[in-house]
Amino acid sequence: MQLNNEVALVTGGGSGLGRAIVDRFVAEGARVAVLDKSAARLQELQAAHGAKVLGIEGDVRVLADHQKAARECVAAFGKIDCLIPNAGIWDYSMPLVDIPDDRIDAAFDEVFHINVKGYLLAVKACLPALVQSRGSVVFTISNAGFYPNGGGPLYTGAKHAVVGMVRELAYELAPHVRVNGVAPGGMSTDLRGPASLGMANQAISSVPLGEMLTSVLPVGRMPVRAEYTGAYVFFATRGDTFPTTGALLNHDGGMGVRGFFEATGGKDLPQKLRLS
């Protein structure tokens, strides 16, 4: 187990990618505190993992809730080795022209307060514990932090902001805390949209992402949640990633190497190599 006796705090760990990260960290030997807005999901986590998981109900837009999570994590587990700011919402790729004039202020505030401010507040609250443990932060970014059309201007702008946050905090917190980011691609989860745009009850799983991504990803299919979690384990380990801070891992199925005319360039490799 790569994370034996380590302690992590994950925001938005009650569902989706966050839940998969929690499950993987526990399997790797870690104890995990989870800050999530859903009491029901936290109860499910604790039922699944028992004393290895501590659930804290709260809002990632509120510093006091992050401080409570950090405080309760340290009280229960003695330390924080790794912080994973992960809670987020998606704007369902709504173009600027389609955002209603009377909702754009609220939509901007909602997306940026959850997807950017929520990350910054998490680091602020956990920083003393992370410095004490000489720990690390692993941000969840997105392919939208690097390429267009992974969201609308609200989501894409927010994820680009997180890229800048990784780099700045990697500088500011060195040499005491390592800061890195994982930019996963699409996956079918319960990721919701902004309430200000009437999308609070809409889940990304309602979009046929699997069909859409299979033809455009060089890896040939849409990854499932669990397949993204190894990158978080890698960045959280102390021995293998001691030299690594300020790193941004494009963990998206190869979006950056798609060809202009075809997503993949090696479909006929087995034939050329006479393997079939």
Curated annotation (Swiss-Prot):
PROSITE patterns: ADH_SHORT (PS00061). GO terms for biological process: catabolic process. Keywords: Aromatic hydrocarbons catabolism, NAD, Oxidoreductase. Disulfide bonds: none annotated. NAD(+) binds at residues 9-33. Coiled coil: none annotated. It catalyses: (2R,3S)-3-phenylcyclohexa-3,5-diene-1,2-diol + NAD(+) = biphenyl-2,3-diol + NADH + H(+). Pathway: Xenobiotic degradation; biphenyl degradation; 2-hydroxy-2,4-pentadienoate and benzoate from biphenyl: step 2/4. GO terms for molecular function: cis-2,3-dihydrobiphenyl-2,3-diol dehydrogenase activity; oxidoreductase activity, acting on NAD(P)H, oxygen as acceptor. Its EC number is 1.3.1.56. Transmembrane segments: none annotated. Substrate binds at S142. The active site is at Y155. Belongs to the short-chain dehydrogenases/reductases (SDR) family. This is Cis-2,3-dihydrobiphenyl-2,3-diol dehydrogenase. It comes from Pseudomonas sp. (strain KKS102). The lineage of its organism: Bacteria, Pseudomonadati, Pseudomonadota.
